[in-house]
Amino acid sequence: MASQGTKRSYEQMETGGERQNATEIRASVGRMVGGIGRFYIQMCTELKLSDYEGRLIQNSITIERMVLSAFDERRNKYLEEHPSAGKDPKKTGGPIYRRRDGKWVRELILYDKEEIRRIWRQANNGEDATAGLTHMMIWHSNLNDATYQRTRALVRTGMDPRMCSLMQGSTLPRRSGAAGAAVKGVGTMVMELIRMIKRGINDRNFWRGENGRRTRIAYERMCNILKGKFQTAAQRAMMDQVRESRNPGNAEIEDLIFLARSALILRGSVAHKSCLPACVYGLAVASGYDFEREGYSLVGIDPFRLLQNSQVFSLIRPNENPAHKSQLVWMACHSAAFEDLRVSSFIRGTRVAPRGQLSTRGVQIASNENMETMDSSTLELRSRYWAIRTRSGGNTNQQRASAGQISVQPTFSVQRNLPFERATIMAAFTGNTEGRTSDMRTEIIRMMESSRPEDVSFQGRGVFELSDEKATNPIVPSFDMSNEGSYFFGDNAEEYDN
């Protein structure tokens, strides 16, 4: 990792702040989530939601999506210039679920975007509070990561579906800023770059003219973000090659896919943040909690503590398992879709099952689903322990390279081995080491071959009791070393389609 001195912490990225000390960071992150909470309470009042309805995660998601859409400048402008039938560019809305005579009913609501913006600004001391908007985008992104497998998107860009552990943040919108870039996985960045290069190959004018100049700047910026995620000199050098290419084409795509594969073992630094649904912050604010005064952190005990004391409900379809639905949302709340299930299970205190064993579909309910048979249940979002979220790839003892597993990008800073099938991964690296990047490729392959699955990552790091807020007594769990736990193995999760 680059020394902390040159980087802003995630919270600073998230709150758009310059370098601040720990107390100031906690206060500004607190201000951000407090603003989300105040906005949520106001929206519940506007919509006349009962306490129970306000705690329904589906209602929370609709309200979050409305404010995100109200502030989506680019799309708003596009909608005004390309009026489509039946879409009012000045309005936003979605399904709100209400309890009527012992049944859940869906009501489609519509609001002026201007009105939503006014309520949002009012809840955020008159400011646009972009950080709070980004925070909600990351929560939606984490929910998508836990719910869907991006096999189709991977295959479309020529990558291997087994690389799904590199796809964190793949559904984040472009406008998610530095905080969004920090949580994107290596595969996500590679996919964005490949899409861009493919457009350049198919469209002669993509890199030309005034627009092309802007495109080029965006391309180089994305390359630099990806380069910053890699932790070995050879991987970074290859990124320089890709960035400096005069006319990016198939050679660059090859290099990027090679780099993505290498990240299965030589993992990149990807930030993890616990972003909770707006209703959770709303509940806390309503109960009189002052986030700004108390301070808040996305990577410490605070989100765990908040979830210990929040009761959130979810609609449940007839053949879904409420415990499985809870696991899905728990994983989303802690951005743990690509964490080792052994670690997640230990922290949560109940077994966390792979996606393929869950009897649950996504959290959102489609407009054509029958509400007659819908039930609701409490989401169990509490945990047994808490642990610090990591932004490193968990590479072992400074050897800049380490064991990975097809399918883990650690979320929690907790000691474990990262088992992987070296044969499976290395099989993808046969052949092609010629060309301009040959020495770098050789070096990367050498590092991968020398990594051992039994090496321990996050040496000495443990989990903490929920009463231990200063993290004084780490409890280092012992895991069955042979039994790796990856969420998307043997899987039949639905695809994410925009």
Curated annotation (Swiss-Prot):
Late in virus-infected cells, may be cleaved from a 56-kDa protein to a 53-kDa protein by a cellular caspase. This cleavage might be a marker for the onset of apoptosis in infected cells or have a specific function in virus host interaction. GO terms for cellular component: helical viral capsid; host cell; host cell nucleus; ribonucleoprotein complex; viral nucleocapsid. GO terms for biological process: symbiont entry into host cell; viral penetration into host nucleus. A motif (Unconventional nuclear localization signal) lies at residues 1-18. InterPro entries: Flu_NP. The keyword Ribonucleoprotein applies. Residues 1-21 are annotated as: Disordered. One of its GO terms (molecular function) is RNA binding. It is found in: Virion; Host nucleus. The keyword Ribonucleoprotein applies. A motif (Bipartite nuclear localization signal) lies at residues 198-216. SUPFAM superfamilies: flu NP-like (SSF161003). Keywords: Capsid protein, Helical capsid protein, Host nucleus, Host-virus interaction, Ribonucleoprotein, RNA-binding, Viral nucleoprotein, Viral penetration into host nucleus, Virion, Virus entry into host cell. Homomultimerizes to form the nucleocapsid. May bind host exportin-1/XPO1. Binds to viral genomic RNA. Protein-RNA contacts are mediated by a combination of electrostatic interactions between positively charged residues and the phosphate backbone and planar interactions between aromatic side chains and bases. Encapsidates the negative strand viral RNA, protecting it from nucleases. The encapsidated genomic RNA is termed the ribonucleoprotein (RNP) and serves as template for transcription and replication. The RNP needs to be localized in the host nucleus to start an infectious cycle, but is too large to diffuse through the nuclear pore complex. NP comprises at least 2 nuclear localization signals that are responsible for the active RNP import into the nucleus through cellular importin alpha/beta pathway. Belongs to the influenza viruses nucleoprotein family. This is Nucleoprotein. It comes from Influenza A virus (strain A/Goose/Guangdong/1/1996 H5N1 genotype Gs/Gd). The lineage of its organism: Viruses, Riboviria, Orthornavirae, Negarnaviricota, Polyploviricotina.
